[in-house]
Amino acid sequence: MRKPELLVPASSLEVLKVAVIFGADAVYIGGEVFGLRAKAKNFSMEDMKEGVEFAHAHGVKVYVTANILAHNQDLEGVRAYFAELKEIGPDALIISDPGVYRIAMEVCPEIERHISTQANNTNYGTYQFWYEQGAKRVVTARELSLAEIKEIREHIPEEMEIETFIHGAMCISYSGRCLLSNYFTGRDANQGACTHPCRWKYAVVEESRPGEYLPVYENERGTYIFNSKDLCMIEHIPDLLDAGIDSYKIEGRMKTALYVATVARTYRKAIDDYLESPKKYEENMEWYRDQISNCTYRQFTTGFFYGKPDHESQIYDSNTYVKEYTYLGIVGEKDEQGRYTIEQRNKFSVGEEIEVMKPDGDNITVTVKGIWDDEGNAMESAPHPKQKLWIDLGVELDKFDILRRKEME
């Protein structure tokens, strides 16, 4: 049985390093252009170079998204961008547009080419076509069942790889080809600027009563008719393996380091446990469920994997996340006094109980003993986001440990 790759997103250099440390086999990132995530922090060329070097030093691959649906005016920019990427040396480019693919073949043929889910890859004929064009991997359309993916595996060359999203947010539109954002706001989802109108509240209009807007109530908060639950396949690793999927992809190029660390660590352990012993995987199932629920999410569904989703896969009464923990920061360097630096993300205080999340699966509850600013002044709390601080938690920490606080129920 071929060990599947765990492919994790990263919105920034910091998050890439966390993904690597917390168990990713590969990380996918976007540059400042052509990557379909205009709102993400994204990577400068300098950060991308450092990220690729860091990942490769830890035996982890890096894939760069270039899955924009390009217009004529984009093509020369794509060519220049790929020439720069050639010097950096990522392991693959993720592409959906045939014109962009053609440029990649011309400019950097030595870099693997993976076909994005945006290309609507729903059948083995599509896979065979892209294989003939030299693609190493194709990402399945979100609308495929495990049975369909298994059939694709049976009809394509063994060396061709199948990548599938197994966790994260679900777009209500067909493989993400949505026009709602463009229609409502002029921001094109296929150019990376989606405003997520699927999460908004809607009313209906009866055609003979123009101007009369009728709310469709589920309860006092209204209804969110396009609002999908999040995909989660942590309980179905055996079925993913049986389908012949080579790469298990986590959605989330706009997520925090806490989210990425939590999901990467949980799936890393689940995959490794099952390959070691299916019994061990079953015995640890409650731990996986508990851990995967510790990051922000919108309730869970298995999507299309076991057939077309029904009403149970939608959230009708809210567009809000479930939030179990608050992200406080990432542990950095240690000073001579045994304090550790962090760039804090949310407020915490001296005397407060927080958790240290470690890559090996341990969560350590600690009390904040002291907080100092970068000039050495003692502080009672950390109220300013992104402020550099020094902290004493009374325990030994490691670089890239994650600090979080459990929210009150």
Regions found by a protein language model. Name each.
Residues 64-65, 95, 115-117:
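Short beta-strand elements of ligand-binding domains
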Residues 108:
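Conserved phosphotransfer cores of two-component systems
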Residues 76, 113-122:
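Gly/Gly-Pro- and Ser/Thr-rich, intrinsically disordered tail segments characteristic of DNA damage-repair
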Residues 37-56:
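Glycine-rich, positively charged N-terminal anion/phosphate-binding segment
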Residues 99-100:
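Alpha-helix capping/helix-boundary segments
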Residues 1-10, 15-21, 26-33, 51-52, ...:
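Surface-exposed amphipathic alpha-helical tracts and adjacent flexible/coil segments at the periphery
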